[in-house]
Amino acid sequence: MIRALGSRGFAPVSALLEDVGSMFVLTGKTLVSAIRPPYPYGNEFVSQFLFALRLGWFPMIVTSVALAYGPAGIQAANFLNLFGALDRLGGLFVLAVIREFAPLVCAIVMAGVAGTAMCADLGARKIREELDALMVLGVDPVKNLVVPRFLSLMLVTGLFDIYALIFGTFGGMLVTLVNGAPLSGFFSTYFTNATTTELWGSLVKTTIFGAIIAIVCCYKGMTASGGPEGVGRAVNQAVVIAFLAIGAFNYVFTQALLATHPELSMVR
């Protein structure tokens, strides 16, 4: 009985570890398939790119401005006003928006709108046994279905990071104007702290976020079972796992960036 209870208690952990291992395997297969010719997924890549772009552009803009103006902007401005140093808001926005908010906003939006749609699409195909039919016909599902989604989501997420930086900065400008301060102080400290390393780090991190979302959502979709309810569970699990993976990678990437570039820890 004790052994049964123990195995039942460790079953979720074992299943999670098995999923993580399988996702790493899928990542390797995807990278190899993306590099190795032939490249039959051009039309599917364009279709998935436009699909993700159409779904995510408006939520991304709204979320970027809202988060930059609200939690980052208003709270930071209230704190700096206590010391009469509102001109330092631009430097803090580099730390908040470029390093954290912009990549995370892109990841949250793309996982919530594009990632779930990809998972549901592949899950429905799995339930209808379309994936098995493709393999019977000699068509590789990884090369023809996963690779275009993987590449398109990386590209769209990296592109959205640029827009998130622009609209996040716009939120900081609004906060500065609402507090009656000139924009010259905001831009002075903003451009003093916004180094090339910081910008490239934000872009690389966001692009990898897109890769993580694509792998997790494609894997959960291609392993869905149990009919329509199973597809719903797969979508739910994909979002949760993607957010956990993004949080873990974000911590590791940021710490590695600060360790290799300690000058980024200082607000000038």
Regions found by a protein language model. Give the residues of each.
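Active-site cofactor/substrate anionic-group-binding motifs, chiefly glycine-
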Residues: 40, 48-105
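Membrane-helix cytosolic exit motif
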Residues: 221, 240, 244, 248-262
